[in-house]
């Protein structure tokens, strides 16, 4: 049971960090989109990085839900 608690806490900490990073990436993507066509060459890289952060966040949230339901 102690192992599960630690895992849940670790995942919650990772989710908090990723949420913060994801919010910043979302704002960066928004700022880049507002400035189009200037810096359009960066669009795909920023979009891909933003997608990856949100994919990781979704994965962690699903893992957390499984651990919480297993209690």
From Swiss-Prot:
Lineage: superkingdom: Bacteria
Family recorded in the similarity comment: Belongs to the UPF0437 family.
GO biological process terms on file: nitrogen fixation
UniProt xrefs under InterPro entries: Helix_hairpin_bin_sf (IPR029012), Put_N_fixation (IPR007774)
Keyword entries, A-Z: Nitrogen fixation
Coiled coil region boundaries: none
Segments crossing the lipid bilayer: none
Disulfide topology: none
Keyword Nucleotidyltransferase: no
Identification of the protein by name: UPF0437 protein asl1434
Source organism of this protein record: Nostoc sp. (strain PCC 7120 / SAG 25.82 / UTEX 2576)
